[in-house]
Amino acid sequence: MQAVANKPVAELVDYRTEPSKYRHWSLATDGEIATLTLNIDEDGGIRPGYKLKLNSYDLGVDIELHDALQRVRFEHPEVRTVVVTSGKPKIFCSGANIYMLGLSTHAWKVNFCKFTNETRNGIEDSSQYSGLKFLAACNGTTAGGGYELALACDEIVLVDDRNSSVSLPEVPLLGVLPGTGGLTRVTDKRRVRRDHADIFCTISEGVRGQRAKDWRLVDDVVKQQQFAEHIQARAKALAQTSDRPAGAKGVKLTTLERTVDEKGYHYEFVDATIDADGRTVTLTVRAPAAVTAKTAAEIEAQGIKWWPLQMARELDDAILNLRTNHLDVGLWQLRTEGDAQVVLDIDATIDANRDNWFVRETIGMLRRTLARIDVSSRSLYALIEPGSCFAGTLLEIALAADRSYMLDAAEAKNVVGLSAMNFGTFPMVNGLSRIDARFYQEEAPVAAVKAKQGSLLSPAEAMELGLVTAIPDDLDWAEEVRIAIEERAALSPDALTGLEANLRFGPVETMNTRIFGRLSAWQNWIFNRPNAVGENGALKLFGSGKKAQFDWNRV
């Protein structure tokens, strides 16, 4: 096999890894405390052409971080606090590698920043929902994306050695923004006063010592002699706020099994078949034939083979591969296959056992995977036909779609279904359930939908409740769907990306929507501007000894 949907295999990014393959991170556990140590291999870049100096990172480093976090969640339920620190002297992390950014295409930079944002959002997600706390032990200079990683943690402790500082130097040094949530977390999360934030984000040297604490940029500054002892004490204190189980046995995350061929990516419960000429992919999620685990003990015994977790891992991998490796595949056709009642029964099992640590972590995996769909810059059409199983958890996929078409078949039964999972278990990045977001939290339509929880609904019933966009009959189905797909595929992908991002998240703002919808949007615009990436732009000239030449006109 030479290519997947015209994409050379050698150019494909693989998001699967495991600790034995790590080149940059190490994970150690000691009872309720885990330590993630960043010690980057300078020659271990995911692409050639740059060295990862000063503990700077690229996509490959973050793929390892994402994997390590998953292993803490599932393999180490006894861990309550994760200490994030550096294995290099006097440097915590200097952020994204500047030379990598300078060499990268616009699309690579955008996808890189999106994935790193999702990984840091996932840190906060685990703290909020799973009781897994994070402590940034900044044992050296903490700059740019390094500080953004620290910002995602529950607490930040900076060593007071008269040299180490925290900084966001992107504006003065590179002519770009801190693109992994830095600006937003400084204001929304750390509550740094605006004038202090303005100074902090426009000086390259950063802020150190007591001033960093006074400005709320860190929680503590500690002398080097007391640093290790202080970190241990704070890690234990954070652990006391967690309810993760001390005696639970973890579930080993084995390598995800899949087949890759010229048509796409194929898993046991997920399939992504690409139509390269039509620039579309059919993304299908399959339900199991029956419910095979009902109690917490039975669920834990199944481990990674428990359908909700296995399906979520497969879907997550498919999404990441499509987003990174197939930029021109702009329309995702979302389908399901299976018995809708089986999905509702599995949801009932999830709901009954949601206090179990493993079920809770699986819910978290599903929540983050579904959120990944929401923020993907692709058009999403759900196609609901007889034999599909858009019910409960899988109905969330249809609710994430920009449009949903449901065949009103004359003979075959075609249904969608609602479960407890549809009413707050899987909030979007704006904090709302997809039902609440769909109806702008209006009480009457939300109540009408909630009254049908546990029911399987016909096309007419789904249409009346506002759960689907259209219900063509047998005569019109093929033509209406074909026209909708062809019309969408003919529109400007840039305009569609902006359109979809504006329409999907409704009137409610959160820190995460501001990161994706404001910070990322401005960063992506700046990434295209000559002041950053032109021949004389700051990002292009970084490290050359030459001074950037700016176009001084404000736009």
UniProtKB/Swiss-Prot annotation:
What biological-process GO terms show up in the record? fatty acid beta-oxidation
Q: Which Pfam families match?
A: ECH_1 (PF00378)
What is the enzyme's main class? lyase
Can you state which reaction this protein catalyses?
Answer: 2,3-epoxy-2,3-dihydrobenzoyl-CoA + 2 H2O = (3Z)-6-oxohex-3-enoyl-CoA + formate + H(+)
| Stated pH dependence | Optimum pH is 9.
UniProt keyword terms in alphabetical order = Aromatic hydrocarbons catabolism, Lyase
Q: What induces it?
A: By benzoate.
- GO MF annotation, one: lyase activity
Checking InterPro entries in the record gives:
Benz-CoA_dihydrodiol_lyase, ClpP/crotonase-like_dom_sf, Enoyl-CoA_hydra/iso
Q: What EC number is given for this enzyme? A: 4.1.2.44
- Subunit comment: Homodimer.
What family, per the record? Belongs to the benzoyl-CoA oxygenase component C family.
Instruction: Summarize the protein's role.
Output: Catalyzes the ring opening of 2,3-epoxy-2,3-dihydroxybenzoyl-CoA to form 3,4-didehydroadipyl-CoA semialdehyde.
Name this protein carries in UniProt:
Benzoyl-CoA-dihydrodiol lyase
Which classification does the entry list for the species?
A: Bacteria, Pseudomonadati, Pseudomonadota, Betaproteobacteria, Rhodocyclales
